[in-house]
Curated annotation (Swiss-Prot):
InterPro entries: Yip1/4-like (IPR045231), Yip1_dom (IPR006977). This is Protein YIPF4. It comes from Mus musculus. Its main location: Golgi. Keywords: Golgi apparatus, Membrane, Transmembrane, Transmembrane helix. The chain crosses the membrane at residues 116-136, 141-161, 169-189, 198-218, 226-246. Belongs to the YIP1 family. Residues 137-140, 190-197 are lumenal. Residues 1-115, 162-168, 219-225 are cytoplasmic. It comes from the Eukaryota. It is found in: Golgi apparatus, cis-Golgi network membrane. It is a multi-pass membrane protein. One of its GO terms (cellular component) is Golgi apparatus. The lineage of its organism: Eukaryota, Metazoa, Chordata, Craniata, Vertebrata. GO terms for biological process: endoplasmic reticulum to Golgi vesicle-mediated transport.
Length: 246
């Protein structure tokens, strides 16, 4: 039996390391070229200056100047919402006043139970504008009569035992000026016909007074209704006199 011979020489495969002797490695030389890679970290001179200023302020105890407050959604409301102006609600109340018949199906009590300020004010101002006739003082008179006339109706209603707030009376009286605004352009056309003009004026006053009284005079007044309806009727006669100049 022959003894085993020396192991075969290792032949490296492609991709394996090849070890060479130190004597052969003395003549090996080379270099590795580094790729030209530029990194844009977004650092500019302005950023450095800002960082320096930020550090300076914080060191001096003025870091609170750099704090950014979180935006409150309440601050981004539309202007109409900020002023509590609901155009759809105002339009619905206008329809309730102009069409006071219960058969039309409008929830007319919303004019009284959900009062607002901007709608009646707009109606009163519009009535004042068409009542000018070159007399600017009429505007202040109409607004004054609206405020103090509503106060008189409110006090009378409370004396008679009605559960109504001044804001409700102010809103109802203001909205109920709309019938007088409707008849205003008609009076311009038929002004030369005295009889027709008088009938239209009476119709407008009755229309306005009925709209206001039907909203303000509740079942709690019972037999005392005429005591409140009569001053409301007189109030709208006075409003009409400011318009016509009578």
């Amino acid at each position: 039996m022959q003894p085993p011979g020396p192991p075969p020489a290792y032949a490296p495969a492609n991709g394996d390391f090849t070890f060479v002797s130190s004597a052969d490695a003395e003549d090996l030389s080379g270099s590795i070229a580094a790729p030209d890679v530029k990194l844009n970290l977004g650092v500019s001179g302005d950023f450095i200056k800002e960082s320096t200023a930020t550090t300076f302020l914080r060191q001096r105890g003025y870091g609170w100047l750099l704090e950014v407050e979180d935006e409150d959604p309440e601050d981004n409301k539309p202007l109409l919402e900020e002023l509590d102006i609901d155009l759809k609600d105002i339009y619905y109340k206008i329809r309730c006043v102009l069409m006071p018949m219960p058969s039309l199906g409008f929830n007319r009590q919303v004019v009284r139970d959900n009062p607002d300020f901007w709608g009646p004010l707009a109606v009163v101002l519009f009535f004042s504008m068409i009542s000018l006739y070159g007399q600017f003082r009429v505007v202040s008179w109409i607004i004054t009569i609206w405020i103090f006339g509503s106060l008189t109706i409110f006090l009378l209603a409370r004396v008679l035992g009605g559960e109504v707030a001044y804001g409700q009376v102010l809103g109802v009286i203001g909205y109920s000026l709309l019938p007088l605004i409707v008849i205003a352009p008609i009076l311009l056309v038929v002004g030369s016909f005295e009889m027709v003009s008088t009938l239209i004026k009476l119709f407008g006053v009755f229309w306005a007074a009925y709209s206001a009284a039907s909203l303000l005079v509740g079942e709690e007044f019972k037999t005392k209704k005429p005591l409140l309806i009569y001053p409301i009727f007189l109030l709208y006669i006075y409003f009409l006199s400011l318009y016509t100049g009578v």
